[in-house]
């Protein structure tokens, strides 16, 4: 995927050095990156200039769709992405809102499916969007956001990719997703997969055609210890043709996504890639 490599090169050429207080590492940073994925043509943005994986990213987002708040439930789906944040985060371990082992608190999917109202009760943001789209309605506010500053203290992590805005033009569904920060060598492909899959699934369960997914990143960065591999290995490789994502056509409703869907319902066809690259991870 050339756009991915172009962003990496832009960060190297134009980035500003920033000291990250959380990680204690320096990173080259640019502000504002826009990526586009043609979901209608099934051009699945799985990085080909290094070996990449997709099922963990999909599993995590299915967990968000289900409103999970336990790392154990994410593990059952096939991803361990929440284990550390739920169980190894000192600030969260000492937080009185933590309910016990594997509890994540009010993050991501909880906000999307059960946003707390000031007067009591909750709002199911996702169901409202699905119901509207099935009826051909776009009220220009088909938005699901995980970003709730009033409850940051009640969760183990602030959302990174935080808001998803659907737009319906005729019978074609588009998606614009917003991300506040991105570790480009390691994290971006994970998020690319999620943006693509979210639009593909929403189009499928609402009976619409999938159109374009627009992925907007505010702070895109490469850590200093990732630069040698990026410059000397990944950027010297030619991207290969993008694969296709095959989603089980029997997935027809939000209830299906909430109940029986597993990672066996997602397959990739035609994926060819270069060898793996083991980038350092900033904890």
UniProtKB/Swiss-Prot annotation:
One GO BP: methylation
MF term (GO), any: thymidylate synthase activity
InterPro entries in UniProt: Thymidate_synth/dCMP_Mease (IPR045097), Thymidate_synth/dCMP_Mease_dom (IPR023451), Thymidate_synth/dCMP_Mease_sf (IPR036926), Thymidylate_synthase (IPR000398)
Compartment(s) where it occurs, according to its Swiss-Prot or TrEMBL record: Cytoplasm
One matching Pfam family: Thymidylat_synt
Active site: 160
Binding-site positions, (6R)-5,10-methylene-5,6,7,8-tetrahydrofolate: 183, 282
Superkingdom assignment: Bacteria
Keywords noted in UniProt: Cytoplasm, Methyltransferase, Nucleotide biosynthesis, Transferase
Enzyme Commission number(s) from the entry: 2.1.1.45
Binding site for dUMP: 22, 180-183, 191, 221-223
Disulfide topology: none
Enzyme class, UniProt record, top EC level: transferase
Catalytic activity: dUMP + (6R)-5,10-methylene-5,6,7,8-tetrahydrofolate = 7,8-dihydrofolate + dTMP
Gene Ontology cellular-component annotations: cytosol
Keyword Cytoplasm: yes
Pathway(s) of this molecule: Pyrimidine metabolism; dTTP biosynthesis
Matches recorded under SUPFAM superfamilies: Thymidylate synthase/dCMP hydroxymethylase (SSF55831)
Location, primary (coarse class): cytoplasm
Subunit relationships: Homodimer.
Family: Belongs to the thymidylate synthase family. Bacterial-type ThyA subfamily.
NCBIfam families found in the cross-reference section: PRK01827.1-4, thym_sym
Reported function: Catalyzes the reductive methylation of 2'-deoxyuridine-5'-monophosphate (dUMP) to 2'-deoxythymidine-5'-monophosphate (dTMP) while utilizing 5,10-methylenetetrahydrofolate (mTHF) as the methyl donor and reductant in the reaction, yielding dihydrofolate (DHF) as a by-product. This enzymatic reaction provides an intracellular de novo source of dTMP, an essential precursor for DNA biosynthesis.
Protein name: Thymidylate synthase
Organism phylogeny: Bacteria, Pseudomonadati, Pseudomonadota, Gammaproteobacteria, Alteromonadales
């Amino acid at each position: 995927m050339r756009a991915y490599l172009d962003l990496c090169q832009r960060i190297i050429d134009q980035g500003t050095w920033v000291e990250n207080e959380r990680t204690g590492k320096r990173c080259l940073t640019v502000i504002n990156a826009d990526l586009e994925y043609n979901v209608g043509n099934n051009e699945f943005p799985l990085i080909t200039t290094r070996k990449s994986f997709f099922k963990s990213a999909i599993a995590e987002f299915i967990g968000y769709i289900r409103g999970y708040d336990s790392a154990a439930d994410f593990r059952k789906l096939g991803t361990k992405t929440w284990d550390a944040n739920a169980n190894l985060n000192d600030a969260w371990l000492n937080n009185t809102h933590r309910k016990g082992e594997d509890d994540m608190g009010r993050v991501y999917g909880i906000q999307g499916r059960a946003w707390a109202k000031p007067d009591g009760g909750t709002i199911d943001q996702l169901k409202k969007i699905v119901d509207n789209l099935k009826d051909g309605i776009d009220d220009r506010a088909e938005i699901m956001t995980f970003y709730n500053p009033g409850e940051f203290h009640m969760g183990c992590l602030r959302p990174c990719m935080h808001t998803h805005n659907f737009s319906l033009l005729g019978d074609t569904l588009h998606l614009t997703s917003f991300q506040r920060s991105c570790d480009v060598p390691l994290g971006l492909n994970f998020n690319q997969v999620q943006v693509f899959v979210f639009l593909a699934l929403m189009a499928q369960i609402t009976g619409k055609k999938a159109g374009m997914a627009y992925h907007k990143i505010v702070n895109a960065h490469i850590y200093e210890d990732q630069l040698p591999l990026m410059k000397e290995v990944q950027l010297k490789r030619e991207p290969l043709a993008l694969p296709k994502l095959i989603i089980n056509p029997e997935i027809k409703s939000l209830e299906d996504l909430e109940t029986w869907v597993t990672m066996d319902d997602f397959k990739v066809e035609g994926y060819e890639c270069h060898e793996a690259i083991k980038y350092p991870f900033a904890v």
